[in-house]
Amino acid sequence: SFPTRRSSDLNKEVEEGFIQFLVPYYTSMNNVESPFEIQKFVREIRSGDYNSFFQRLQSFFADTTYEIIREQELHYENVLFIIFKLVGFYVKVEYHTSRGRIDLVLQTDKFIYIMEFKLNGTAEEALQQINDKHYALPFETDGRRLFKIGVNFSAETRNIEKWIVE
């Protein structure tokens, strides 16, 4: 007979596998600093400190080797999804509404972050899309504070060029 494992043990193994193998693949972060850096992301997200969070992301992406970034917008979306999922936040990518598809929705106990990404566009265009397509509408009756965030990535610098928040 095979030993039985609790679901939480398996989840912990999966999480450790993500940290050990995927995060270093997508970034230059090593195994020692990964948990510490991820804790900083968590604190900033939980406190609604989106500027510190995006500044940390800029530094994070700047330290990522350019060879692994192929399809840039998808790369950034994947990295954000992995980080948010690892730390236990409710996160959805390509969230469908009646008017379109939100690139990323992140929910904490106090905040909802609606993020739209552009590659070689503008953060203003990304935010305008959130407003034009009424992406916040499904969340308006929720009691949590809502942040609409337009983000532009630069293919040249392979990083976040600008973000704006409403």
Model regions and ranges:
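Mg2+/Mn2+-dependent nuclease catalytic core
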Residues: 119-136
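Nucleic acid-processing catalytic cores of prokaryotic defense/repair systems
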Residues: 82, 86-88, 127, 131, ...
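Leucine-rich, amphipathic alpha-helical/linker segments
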Residues: 11-66
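Active-site metal-binding core of divalent-cation-utilizing nuclease and nuclease-like domains
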Residues: 83-109
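Short, small-residue-biased leader/transition segments that mark boundaries at the very start
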Residues: 1-7
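Conserved catalytic cores of phosphodiester-cleaving nucleases, focusing on short active-site segments
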Residues: 80, 102-119, 133
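Domain-level recognition of nuclease-like catalytic cores that cleave nucleotide substrates
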Residues: 138, 142-166
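Acidic-basic catalytic patches of nuclease active cores, encompassing PD-(D/E)XK
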Residues: 59-92
